[in-house]
């Protein structure tokens, strides 16, 4: 199972934080910092992309009889330019399959954004999350075909654009003007003007 997907830059600024296992917010931040410390100190030329998890972060103190043990958790990452794409998985997942999944994720983002960069992920976070949701849901991999992933995300983007254009048409009508005036507190002024 995939427990978390983290994307952060070389300054430990998160660009995506998605947990599929319940983890308290303070522990999420601590986990991100510890994963960053572990990864940033590694020499990617001589060391693998596989790590063991920081101690006791995925287990809450109240939930000691949870089936997840830290010895079963791995951190698998890949560095692209200024970003680290990191998956936190249990030992049931193949390390090489997760590395391939990271590659699929990045290729899908490249196709959606045409040469993805960090700013694309910041300003188009909805597309970033949509791509991830097409690949992983509930901690399980559901799609690995880049063409299908991109087609699904394109459909979502087209649906969002058509919804936005319908909202734009609504605001140009009298009803839309009424809603806009009412929201701004000038409903009486609008009503007398009609």
From Swiss-Prot:
Transmembrane segments: none annotated. Keywords: Cytoplasmic vesicle, Golgi apparatus, Membrane, Protein transport, Transport. GO terms for cellular component: AP-3 adaptor complex; cytoplasmic vesicle membrane; Golgi apparatus; intracellular membrane-bounded organelle. It is a peripheral membrane protein. Disulfide bonds: none annotated. Gene3D superfamilies: 3.30.450.60. Adaptor protein complex 3 (AP-3) is a heterotetramer composed of 2 large adaptins (APL5 and APL6), a medium adaptin (APM3) and a small adaptin (APS3). Part of the AP-3 complex, an adaptor-related complex which is not clathrin-associated. The complex is associated with the Golgi region as well as more peripheral structures. It facilitates the budding of vesicles from the Golgi membrane and may be directly involved in trafficking to the vacuole. Required for the transport via the ALP pathway, which directs the transport of the cargo proteins PHO8 and VAM3 to the vacuole. Present with 1240 molecules/cell in log phase SD medium. This is AP-3 complex subunit sigma. It comes from Saccharomyces cerevisiae (strain ATCC 204508 / S288c) (Baker's yeast).
């Amino acid at each position: 199972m995939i427990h978390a997907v983290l994307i952060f830059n070389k300054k430990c600024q998160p660009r995506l934080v998605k947990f599929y296992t319940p983890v308290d917010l303070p522990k999420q931040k601590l986990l991100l910092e510890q994963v960053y410390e572990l990864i940033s100190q590694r020499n990617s030329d001589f060391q693998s992309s596989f790590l063991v998890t920081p101690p006791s972060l995925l287990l809450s103190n109240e939930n000691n009889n949870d089936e997840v043990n830290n010895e079963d958790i791995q951190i698998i990452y890949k560095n692209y330019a200024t970003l680290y794409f990191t998956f936190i998985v249990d030992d049931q997942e193949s390390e090489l399959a997760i590395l391939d999944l990271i590659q699929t994720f990045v290729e899908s983002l490249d196709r959606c954004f045409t040469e993805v960069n960090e700013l694309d992920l910041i300003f188009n976070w909805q597309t970033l999350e949509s791509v991830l949701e097409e690949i992983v849901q509930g901690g399980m991999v559901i799609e690995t075909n880049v063409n299908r992933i991109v087609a699904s995300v394109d459909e979502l983007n087209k649906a969002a654009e058509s919804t936005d254009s319908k909202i734009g048409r609504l605001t140009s009508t009298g009803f839309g003007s009424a809603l806009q005036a009412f929201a701004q507190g000038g409903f009486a002024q609008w009503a007398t003007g009609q």
